[in-house]
Amino acid sequence: MTSVRKAFAVVAGAAAVILTPATAHADPGHQVTYTVTTPNTLTATIQYMNSDPPSQAAYNADSSKYMNNVQAPISDGQPVVYTTTLANPNQWAIVTASGILHWPDSGNGPAAFHCEIAVDGQVVAKQDATSAVTCATRPW
């Protein structure tokens, strides 16, 4: 190869590297952990986002495609934990819990709940409430 051809090959190769768009690596998503506890003995209705909707409109049209709805026995502060992967947890991570006390085990009065959302191991939202609780990474 002549020196002109070598120089052209080097310049062409460098231009190809510079002009070729970088391959986008898909975000593998973030591990989202939802935790619900109560000091009471009850069956809780727990809902949590298990997959990212493509848009708010899609979520509004059929939230059951993206939310899990679970009836879970829970008591004595023992955590109920659900884990999923979300691409955009800042937009979509949410967990709600409500329940009815089992009388006489829990006495009278409203149920007390605590919820937390952790993203990649870091707690990003937590809330305490009576009767029903919601933890979310954004206002709903």
Task: List each model region and its residues.
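Activation corresponds to long, low-complexity, non-globular regions
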Residues: 15-18, 26-30, 132, 137-140
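Surface-exposed loop/edge segments in extracytoplasmic proteins
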Residues: 56-59, 68, 121-126
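Generic detector of solvent-exposed, compositionally biased contiguous segments
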Residues: 3-11, 70-80, 127, 134-136
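Short, surface-exposed binding/anchoring microloops in extracellular/periplasmic proteins
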Residues: 27-65
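Secretory targeting and sorting signals
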Residues: 1-26
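Extracytosolic low-complexity repeat regions of secreted or lipid-anchored proteins
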Residues: 81-137
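Tryptophan-paired
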Residues: 59-87
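Solvent-exposed loop and beta-edge segments used for protein-protein assembly and interaction
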Residues: 26-28, 40, 76, 87-89, ...
